[in-house]
UniProtKB/Swiss-Prot annotation:
Coiled coil: none annotated. Involved in pre-mRNA splicing and cell cycle control. Keywords: mRNA processing, mRNA splicing, Nucleus, Spliceosome. This is Pre-mRNA-splicing factor RSE1. One of its GO terms (cellular component) is U2 snRNP. InterPro entries: Beta-prop_RSE1/DDB1/CPSF1_1st (IPR018846), Cleavage/polyA-sp_fac_asu_C (IPR004871), RSE1/DDB1/CFT1/CPSF1 (IPR050358), WD40/YVTN_repeat-like_dom_sf (IPR015943). It comes from Candida albicans (strain SC5314 / ATCC MYA-2876). The lineage of its organism: Eukaryota, Fungi, Dikarya, Ascomycota, Saccharomycotina. Pfam families: Beta-prop_RSE1_1st, Beta-prop_RSE1_2nd, CPSF_A. Associated with the spliceosome. Transmembrane segments: none annotated. The gene is RSE1. One of its GO terms (molecular function) is U2 snRNA binding. Its main location: nucleus.
Amino acid sequence: MMMRDGNISGPKKKKFTTKCRPFSFYKNRHIIMLINDESVYLYNLTLKPPSYYISSIVGQFYKQDNSTKNAQQLVLVSSTTLQLFEINEEAGKLELQSSQNLLGIINSIEKICLSEVDGVVITSDSGNLSILQYDNKTKKFISKIQEPMTKNGWGRNYVGENLAIDPENRCILVAAMEKNKLFYKIESNSSGSKELSSPLEAHSKQVLCLKIVALNTDHNNPLFGALELTPEKKCIINYYELDQGLNHVVKKKPNSSNSDPLPNDVNYLIPLPGHIGGMVVCGTNWCFYDKLDGPRIYLPLPRRNGQTQDSIIVNHVTHVLKKKKFFILLQNALGDLFKLTVDYDFDKEIIKNISITYFDTIPPALSLNIFKNGFLFANVLNNDKLLYQFEKLGDDLTEGELVINSSDYESLNSVRESVTSFKLKGLDNLALIDVLETLSPITDSKIIDSKLVTLSSHSYVKSITHGVPTTTLVESPLPITPTDIFTTKLSLESANDEYLVISSSLSSKTLVLSIGEVVEDVEDSEFVLDQPTIAVQQVGIASVVQIYSNGIKHVRTVNGNKKTTDWFPPAGITITHATTNNQQVLIALSNLSVVYFEIDATDDQLIEYQDRLEIATTITAMAIQENISEKSPFAIIGCSDETIQVVSLQEHNCLEIKSLQALSANSSSLKMLKSSGKETHVHIGMENGVYARIKIDTINGNLSNSRVKYIGSKPVSLSVIKFSNEIEGILAISSAPWISYLYRDSFKITPLLEIDITNGSSFISEDIGGEGIVGIKDNNLIIFSVGKEDSVFDPSQDLTIATTKLRYTPRKMITNGNRLFISESEYNVQGPFKCNINGDVKENVDEDYYEAFGYEWKQNSWASCIQVVDSKSNQVIQSLQLDGNESIVSMSAVSFNKTSTPSVPASHLVVGVCTNQTILPNSYDKSYLYTFKIGKKHLQLVHKTELDHIPQVLENFQDKLLVASGNHIRLYDIGQKQLLKKSTTIIDFSTNINKIIPQTNRIIICDSHKSSIVFAKFDESQNQFVPFADDVMKRQITSIMNLDIDTLIGGDKFGNIFVTRIDEDISKQADDDWTILKTQDGILNSCPYKLQNLIEFHIGDIITSFNLGCLNLAGTESVIYTGLQGTIGLLIPLVSKSEVELLFNLQLYMQQSQNNLVGKDHLKLRSYYNPIKNVIDGDLLERFLEFDISLKIEISRKLNKSVNDIEKKLIDLRNRSAF
């Protein structure tokens, strides 16, 4: 793959393309494929799914085998992904159990009670009503019911917009925003499974449905409350009752005594539990209880003391206690939680009083969930998700705390006129115990040193690195320079390691340390200390063997006394390599002989096998299975002829070579490990920095199904390590340490971060809290654990996120050397910071207060600033607060009269701002350009330039500032007091330019409304830009990037990705024959030439940035994109015709074989607005890895490939540029 930067010109223009023969045909059975040499073929993979969770629900979705309690789980659903978590009560953490890409766009989700466990009901763009149940064996949701209810796609009449389920599980209501409502009765068949009846229709013409809730009616007919809007723009409440006897839907209106007109600021409905029924209707600063044929009960909503902000309820959660008691937590848009309780007279069946008290303040959430075991999950809006634990229920109110009683209010007017305020307080009833890191929303990103740096969540810079964090526990110097390190326990029953053995081949010494509360020398180990140790192993019941260069020292403990036995090789012969487990010892001698020992189970003695194996070449490494209860049936021996040999250790053919495998280099380290009680793999570290894993058949010793990964420039050393009781893995050390492990049938290999060791060993000790790793670096001993300091190792997470807190919502990021310039603006917010663009100002701002309670809201107000972040230390080094009510709309680094390159940073930073800007309707008072000088340490204001237009786009073009607004493009140069206008161009057929990519003497213009993409060249004779080519398709573009000088990739606001290119001859003519080209007349109010459309693909998320690069070591350069909802994806160029053919045909068979959980056709999903073109969907293809073996074989036979070939291709594609 060859790519050229758009700012580099030259005589040749190399294309972003694949090397395929032109118009080649491939025929496999009935499939014919056309491949064009000029086309681009990409492979799409989702590296991180969207983390904007539209809903969260709690239920018992599966039963735990060894639990007597009815444990609850949490389901989080984004637009495309369904995830299931459970709470580890001991660690206080959320643990991911399952994550599924539904390959569809989810609209809403609710819980439904199935026969023994809970399931989920989903409405999606497939037009089906889907009921899913979790299968604990496969760790996946499976489809139980797919009920078609409407056509594919979205619309005002799409009935999946609102979803409500009767609390007694008798009926499901789905409703469109306009007109359509469908009622499905839930019935049980003879086998006890749930079925849906034919739908009953209830249409309301010319009425918009804003919200629907299912009401509790005990055993009466199912009833639903709806908030609706009439053509006169008046809000009304209607009730819909399903008459089960007549099988008919009845629309009912509130009691005549409750016919007071609703204020138009009503926004939320809250149903009450069964014995009470009815619902709470909420508006701005008020609420009332409403029940069909019952009186209304009014209450005001509390407001923050000393602030003018309204209290608007946006969220709630109901929790039922014992003896029919319950409480409801209401949350307003500011994040304040209020506890609503009802004093109910069971004898008279009336409500005596409703009270509201202030509970706590947490970040505003989309949904709240309470677990029976006392946890509260907050699905926080635009930030990390939070898990709290209840410390108390807020019943112990002190004197002076606010209590609102309904008995004090008689009408809606009295409630609306009342002002009830409360004083904010820190968390009192809740305690934060866990944070679920998310990226939504991502507004911009850059790749810096293989890290993806994003502007994401609410006011953060988040650096995403492939790797697992580590926590250093102990680091101390050693008296020798170590080359190897070992740990061992002294008896079979011991749970902890007791000896730490450090060997030095440089000084021919061995150091034995005891492991306990303190680490100290062992005086009575009986080990040989004046020679380097090759291996140490606890064998038998209570014995330890030390293998060193000149022999084996066997130390047995008998009745508390230590007895030693020595074994020596022949004179002049030394031991070079060894591998051991509790029952077997295998050593290699310098005369190329292999000697095998077994442990006598009766007295722990070493028994030498009489025959020896002679190897023809030098032995480089060897391994037998470790940490197993039985004997290893095979040994693996690495030889200097770049092969490994499988040697039998079974009685009938001991030391017989069974198979041989060629390698790409000599093996430097070998390990054999049984994975999750299923398959056994040989792990190979090679001298060229390659790590490989090969499956070994434990019956006949055959090797197959290899996986390779380049992990560094140095020879790879391997050690078996233990992460937990369930997971064992490999520590692989090259130029950096990595770990590999199998987790839920998925093999992961991940670098370790923030640690540098040259050798390591597993380390188990209660003093460090369990499993750890002990390593050496130079003359230092390092003990560390895998995972963050405050958490245990999570095998499902192989990405580490480092965060830097910002002030406001970040908009754009510019890299300039080692610094990041970040523009931040937030609407309807009044910032507490003072303007300091003209110099430093003393601040007295309690940032912890605003972090907890947020900034004060103010209508049509803006808070904006520029912050400078050091990309290496992730620290904010400068913050510039803007003056007054200014909003930042654009920013660019510019080199006036100086060429900017990655090694020569830009000289100035220009920021475009507007004053008193409003959105919907869009307006502003004035606009300016702030010009800052980029110094070595800080930004310094040079001058301020007033404009007569909004600076929508700023870019650096030919050492000048390019400013675009509407359909105008202007060039500015720097002056002493302000920027000086040098050129003006009007693009007649554009209306709203929102992106520009500068090239050497050309620019690529993007329009968000009309003309889509335009290529234009700067004509020096006319002193303006002349457009000469544009796109045939009109798009509303959100992000764009050059692939080469003629090819670009972009995304639009509807979630589509496209690649377009200008014809090579037209591009060459624009460079060589510009005089002729610029005189060509346009066609139909557009350019004379059109772009070629190469790629079309629907992602389902709004693309906010593209980057060229890779996220792994020595990977292939690919396109990495980010989405607004937190999506991170990868587009890998396919480089051969055979690769494209194989993946294309595999995709066809996968489309036929896979059952979509929501009933969405894959081709329709990826062709939402335009037919899919030249993109292979890796998300679909990787489901092949999850299929059962019979289906894998069926598909592979159709492709004339083996299952291993297809699996290897899919894994290699992922490893090509990512992880």
